[in-house]
Amino acid sequence: MKRDKKEQVVSEVSEKLRRSQGIYLTEFQGLSVARMAELRNEFRKAGVEYRVVKNTLIKKALSDMEGADKLAPALKSTTAVAFGYDDPIAPARVITKFSKTNEALKFKMAAIDGVVFGSDKLPALSEMLTKTENIGRAAGVINNVVASVPMVVNAVMRNLVSVIDQVGKQKQ
């Protein structure tokens, strides 16, 4: 690869790294071309971009970012990067599901919002709720609280009326 082409790749990868909420490094050595195409298709369905990049070019692209030195140990052998733009957990789900039937795909490391996760954290990452799911749950809790306020007020009013009625009966 010529120098200007390498610089272009570094620039593109740097831009993708800046835009990504989640970055996942994988090893794909031993995956057939057909399996790799299948994996890319699964990533595409999940809204994730998956790209094979040389380790030296990834290192250069990461040099601008904080915590890049923590990802350096994972940049050995063949490396592909999964960029999670909208959902930082989507790549973890795809990798987990795909690696169950394809042992050649190996998760190396991930960085989500500057926090680095090792290969042992993939199961936990894949089970996390998405931002949308968390917002939905929070909205449901708030809705339940708001809906229960009138019931509590009605119960207090009913009890007050009952007490007043009892006092009135006692005075008669």
UniProtKB/Swiss-Prot annotation:
Keywords: Ribonucleoprotein, Ribosomal protein, RNA-binding, rRNA-binding
InterPro entries named among the record's database cross-references: Ribosomal_uL10, Ribosomal_uL10-like_sf, Ribosomal_uL10_bac, Ribosomal_uL10_bac_type
GO cellular component, one term: ribosome
Gene3D superfamilies for the chain: 3.30.70.1730, 6.10.250.290
Keyword Hydrolase: no
Superkingdom of the source species: Bacteria
CDD domains: Ribosomal_L10
GO biological process: translation
GO molecular function, one term: large ribosomal subunit rRNA binding
Keyword Nucleotide-binding in annotation: no
Functional description taken from the UniProt entry: Forms part of the ribosomal stalk, playing a central role in the interaction of the ribosome with GTP-bound translation factors.
Subunit structure comment from the entry: Part of the ribosomal stalk of the 50S ribosomal subunit. The N-terminus interacts with L11 and the large rRNA to form the base of the stalk. The C-terminus forms an elongated spine to which L12 dimers bind in a sequential fashion forming a multimeric L10(L12)X complex.
Family annotation (HAMAP family): Ribosomal_uL10
Protein name: Large ribosomal subunit protein uL10
Organism: Chlorobium luteolum (strain DSM 273 / BCRC 81028 / 2530) (Pelodictyon luteolum)
